[in-house]
């Protein structure tokens, strides 16, 4: 009888555990146990699990590229993703952890307060173990918080305009205060978004102490997300905004838009973590590792800051985007600011 390979043994072990769980009336997620051996054993167990699910607030086009790249690298593992806002996704993660009925395996968030709190507590996560985290180009010491949350990407926001309506464009944030743009500007509603609250406060700290109040006087259109602002800019529903990511993708598609990063420009990092409630714990580790590889970063970085150097399509380095001051973004402080904002923008 030929000797069994280590990979065959791992696959057999995972299958046996699954069979025992089913026989005992257990649910499918409980059948998958994390492997603590060599990385090849983790990958083999991940292939036996066969799928992995990502929750993310990243751009849907980049997530689709990530799915293609990941499945090219790991054809035996299907990547599924749910794209939503932090307001929608973070409570799901908390509920899945509390109930022990996980759907997501990896969670990618841009909410700095949630990230800081969860990284400190370690409640929702397990440590990523993939070999790519040791890559000097990634720089684990400045890219991982609390040994669990790892820097994956960053959004950098700037000025955007419709070139048909504004052929001369915008040179500085002050150009948005031109009375001719009254009612034609788009902004993001900060309701529930600590990061967006930080963005408005950044405007007043760095551009003009009264910039937000002056912007409100322009009677801008309000959108639930930066993606909605970009779509409105592309269609001509609005003609300018101070709250859009680099419109690299839109320009490549022929949209009549342009953009500029002012000095300074506001940004917010994306951190990811392997969920303790992951129904596919080994596939979760494989996806986490892939996210910080060159292939993973290339898929995620069109119009964003990358966590590795020299990534095609990236507009900056994610490690250069400061983490927001979460002490100024407590739930009470965010609620108070949102009330102030509503008084200015929705009166």
Map each language-model feature to its residues.
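A ligand-binding cleft/hinge motif common to bilobed small-molecule-binding domains
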Residues: 113-117, 234, 238-258
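Extracellular/periplasmic bilobal clamshell ligand-binding domains
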Residues: 314-347
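Extracytoplasmic ligand-binding site segments that recognize negatively charged/polar headgroups
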Residues: 53-67, 79-97, 101-237
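Bacterial signal peptide processing site
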Residues: 25-27
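C-terminal motif of bacterial Sec signal peptides marking the signal peptidase cleavage site
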Residues: 20-23
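Periplasmic-binding protein-like
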Residues: 151-156, 181-192, 213-216, 222-223, 253-278, 291-313
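A bilobed periplasmic-binding-protein/Venus flytrap-type ligand-binding module shared by bacterial periplasmic
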Residues: 158-165, 200-202, 268-283, 299-303
């Amino acid at each position: 009888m030929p000797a069994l390979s280590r990979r065959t043994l791992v696959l057999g072990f995972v299958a046996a555990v699954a069979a025992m769980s089913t026989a005992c009336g257990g649910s499918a997620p409980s059948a998958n146990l994390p492997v603590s051996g060599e990385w090849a054993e983790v990958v083999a167990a991940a292939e036996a699990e066969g799928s992995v699910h990502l929750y993310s607030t990243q751009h849907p086009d980049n997530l689709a590229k990530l799915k293609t790249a990941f499945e090219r690298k790991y054809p035996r593992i299907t990547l599924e993703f749910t794209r939503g806002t932090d307001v929608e996704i973070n409570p799901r993660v908390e509920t899945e952890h509390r109930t022990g009925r996980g759907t997501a395996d990896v969670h990618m968030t841009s909410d700095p307060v949630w990230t800081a709190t969860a990284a400190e507590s370690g409640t929702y996560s397990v440590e990523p173990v993939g070999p790519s985290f040791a890559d000097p180009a990634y720089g684990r010491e400045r890219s991982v918080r609390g040994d669990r949350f790892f820097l994956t990407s960053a959004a950098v926001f700037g000025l955007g305009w419709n070139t048909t309506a504004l052929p001369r464009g915008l040179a500085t944030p002050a150009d948005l205060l031109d009375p001719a743009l009254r009612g034609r500007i788009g902004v993001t509603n900060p309701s529930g978004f600590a990061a967006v609250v930080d963005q408005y406060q950044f405007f007043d700290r760095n551009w003009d102490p009264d910039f937000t109040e002056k912007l409100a006087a322009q009677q801008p259109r309000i959108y639930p997300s930066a993606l909605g602002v970009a779509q409105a800019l592309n269609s001509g529903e609005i003609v300018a905004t101070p709250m859009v990511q680099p419109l690299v993708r839109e320009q490549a598609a022929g949209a009549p838009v342009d953009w500029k990063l002012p000095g300074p420009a506001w940004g917010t990092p994306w951190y990811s973590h392997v969920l303790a409630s992951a129904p596919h714990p080994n596939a979760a580790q494989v996806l986490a590792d892939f996210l910080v590889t060159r292939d993973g970063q290339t898929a995620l970085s069109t119009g964003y800051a990358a966590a590795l150097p020299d990534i095609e399509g990236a507009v900056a380095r994610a490690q250069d985007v400061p983490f927001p001051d979460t002490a100024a973004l407590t739930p009470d402080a965010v609620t108070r600011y949102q009330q102030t904002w509503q008084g200015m923008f929705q009166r």
